[in-house]
Structure formats: C-alpha cells, structure tokens
Amino acid sequence: MKAPVRALICQGIEALRSNGTLPTNTLPPDFVVERPKTRKHGDFATNVAMLLSKATGSNPRLLAQTLVAALPTSADIARIEIAGPGFINFHLHPVAYQRETINVLKQDNDYGRNLSGQSRTVGVEYVSANPTGPLHVGHGRAAAIGDCLARLLEANGWNVKREFYYNDAGVQIENLVRSVQARARGLKPGDALWPTDAYNGEYIADIAKAYLAGDSINMVDTIITSTKNVDDTAAIHHFAVNYLRNEQNHDLAAFNVDFDIYFLESSLYKDGKVEETVQKLINSGHTYEEGGALWLKSTHFGDDKDRVMRKSDGSYTYFVPDIAYHLSKWQRGYERAITELGADHHGSLARVHAGLQALEIGIPPGWPEYVLHQMVTVMRGGEEVKLSKRSGGYVTLRDLIEETSTDATRWFLIARKPDSQLTFDIDLARQKSNDNPVFYVQYAYARVCSLMHQAHEKNLNYDQTSGMASLDQLSDNTSLCLMIEISRYPEIVQIACELLEPHLIAQYLRELAHAFHTWYHNTPVLVENAVERNAKLTLACATRQVLANGLNLLGVGTPEKM
C-alpha cells in the first residue's frame, strides 16, 4: 500500500522538474512515507516537501501545495491534506483496501513476500552452543530468533543458509571429558577426587552410563559406538561430544528448528584453517610480536586495543578460530552474513571485525552483521525458576517445551526485541485465555475455521468470487479497520527484515487478531443475505491467510480448533 503512494510522489517531483518549478538537478530526496499514529491525519503521511524545501530554499508549505497540485490523479486517493509545516497527508479510498484484501486471497501463501533480496546468498548462524550440556533457555531464544530471521529473509527474497557452529574444541570440552570420565569411574560431585570445574548435571551420569553400556549414537553421516574403555580419553571425547550434539539436535527438532550446515570448530584446526588464517594476517602486515606473543593491530580497525592472537605458549586465543570460521563463510560466497549471539559475546565483535578487515581481501566493514539477544528470566507462580535437576544449574529449552508447548515457547522467546531482557512467564504461557498472546492470535485463526465449518454445516455455500466482488458492501468502520490492518502485513515483513527484528511480526499479529476479534464481536457474519455473507466470509478468510503467513514466519502452528 505504501509503494503506490511513494510512486505518485516521485511522479509529482518529476513533473515539477519537467516544468521548471524544481531545478532539473533536483533528485527525489530520501523521504519518508509512513502511517500516522491516528487515521485523522490520513492513511499515509510524507515529509518530502520539507526535505525538498531545504534543497531549494523554498517555503515548505507552499512547496507542498505545488507538489500536491502536480500529483497524478489516482482512484485510490480520496483526498490529500497539507498539515503543519508542510506534511502531506494522504487519505485512501476504501476501494484501495478492498483490492488489497482480494490480493491476499489471490496470492495465498505468497502474500507479503517480496524479491528485495534478489536471490543473493545470506548465511544466518544461530544457537551455536557448546556441546557440553543441554540447550538452556538462552539457546532457545537464540534458536527462535535465528530461525525467524531466516524465515524473514527468505520471505524477502534472500537465498538463506542456516548454520550451526559447534565449539567442540577448547577448555570447556576438556572439562566435559573429565566429568564423564570421572562418572564412568564411579565418582560423583562432592567426592574428593571429583575434578575441579567439572559439570555436575545428571546428564553427565547419563552419558557415562551410555558409554559404559557400549551404546551407539546415530548421527547424520555415521554411527558412533562406545569403546567402554574408561581410560581412553579420546574415545570418551568423541562419544560425549556426539552424545550431546545428538541431544541438542533432538531438542531443536522438537522446537521446529533445523540447519543446512553444521560446522565444527575442530575442523578448522584439523584442516589447518586456523594456521592458514594467522599466516594471512601476518602476511598482510597487521600483526607484530611482543613478549613472546603474536598480536593483531586491531586498533587500526576500530578496536579499543590490540589483541593477542597467539599466546607465548603457542596456543591461540578464542577469537582467532572465529576469524578463520567467518573467513570460511566469505570464501563460501556469503554476500551477507548474520550471526545471532548472546549479549555476553559483545566484547568479541570488534576483534573479529578487525581480523576480517586486516585480511584485506575485500570483506566489507560491518561484515558479518550481529544480532545480540539479552538474557531470559523464567518465572513460575510469581517466582524466578533458576535450576533444572537435569542440567544441574539452569532451565533447559526442553523444560520449557514440556511445561508449555513448542508454539508458546517460540512465541514468548520471540515476542520482545532481541536486545531487551525477556521474562518468560510459564503460568501465562499455559493459559488458554486472551491474556496469553499466542492463544489470542491462534484463536483468531481458529475462529475463522469455525465460521467456515458453521457455514458448511448450515448449508450456507461460500462463493469467494462473489465475496471478492462484494467487499464494497462492508462499509462499517470495523470492517474497514480490519482491511487496513490486513494491508499492513507486507510492510511489516519488509521492515522486520530490514531491522532484523522478528518481534515486529509477533506485535503485528496481536494487532491483527485484535482487529479481527473486534470485528467478529461487532459484525454478524453468517447472515441471510448471501451477497453480504460472502463478502464477510471473504474478509474473514483474508484475515486467516495473513495470520497463517505471519505465524509461519514465527514457526508457530495454526490450529483449526482451540
């Protein structure tokens, strides 16, 4: 709905350039076309006249009047007003919203999608949990946000590659192996010989039990079988890491999250990519040695201080494999890369960007893009839930799914802006009431399904063609408000993608559901008059389609009965 208004404005500017009112070198400024907060100021408003006045030295209000007079006529525009210092407010004719409602049903599942990404490749990395324990609620938020971002990017025409980076190397993995080995030897937390920095959750005992039993793990490309040898740390390492990878994959599948690529940090060392990346940085001239360590001149690229890459003992600091990993993304042809991380990783971003810039191979500044999410607080009965017996110290994603549902968990973890702290209220997520936002939205969808079922049961045949042709019969304000709300969906899909803020989809769906429930309570639908009934059912079906499309972007289901 916004694009035709913008196109009219551009045509008006061109007309003023052609007749000499505006200089021929006047380019259309980067003006805003937006929906005002209240409809009394129109359906759309623009600041274009004020921007043009700055470039030309004209009075903005007079220029607005001149521009309005130069606009082509449009059947969609009911009237145009000039407000304040030079805002131009457009009031649309209801026929524009009626036509958009018809477009919903014609485009079906494709409604709201666009081709702005031009099939370019974007890699979206998310979750990327260490395989040292069950996925916690923070990983769940990362999974929900990352998966929704991937869906949004696809809806905006991008070729998306979903990627999970396993940090299967380093000190935490060594602690995991020692923990499982100790359990396999009969030790338990609190024993004198229990390892320092060991993992204490019950899942460690489960891994040790499976290892001692000689169990096998079915991975995607191989079957891993325990050797049962408690002294073979390499075998325990291989078994424990893959056991937890398998457990994490199970939880992600239950959460309707999948990936195209699983990338192992260990492969960067195995394939020599870490050494190769370090050598490239040395060759670029952006490193130096001091105190027996190798340093990156990261201050040359915006970091607040230079960073140690290779310590005096020959080991690498943790951000070096991160540079090698992101270099691999660039080499795989990702024109755009988005990495979703917890906010606690904020300190590493500048050094990774610095390392990639120091390679001097054409990687643009700001590549990759980062989306950071804040912590999640889980509440039950008005009190914070802090512990899980299985994990030994945190609430797991599996806990939330089992206590609520996949749909509720996904919704609640997406519902706030990623960089905002989030409270997950288990009691609210389980409610079947309008206070529960996911229930409220799904209930709107189910209500339309119920309407269609009732019409069938009463032998009230629905003629969609007649309904599309008769939408002008719905002249009441609640029907128009619902059509207006429906028409916002494509804009929201585009804006949410541009800002990388999937919570905007959830917010919009609540507003659409509210508009529908209001319409439903104020408008008898299954009336005797067939023409009116078909028009109302058409509006209901268009609402259902947009709800379905939006819920699909969130990875949330569309139940036909509630």
Swiss-Prot record:
Keywords: Aminoacyl-tRNA synthetase, ATP-binding, Cytoplasm, Ligase, Nucleotide-binding, Protein biosynthesis. A motif ('HIGH' region) lies at residues 129-139. CDD domains: ArgRS_core. It catalyses: tRNA(Arg) + L-arginine + ATP = L-arginyl-tRNA(Arg) + AMP + diphosphate. Its main location: cytoplasm. It is found in: Cytoplasm. One of its GO terms (cellular component) is cytoplasm. GO terms for biological process: arginyl-tRNA aminoacylation. It is an enzyme of class 6 (ligase). GO terms for molecular function: arginine-tRNA ligase activity; ATP binding. Its EC number is 6.1.1.19. Monomer. Belongs to the class-I aminoacyl-tRNA synthetase family. This is Arginine--tRNA ligase. It comes from Xylella fastidiosa (strain Temecula1 / ATCC 700964). The gene is argS.
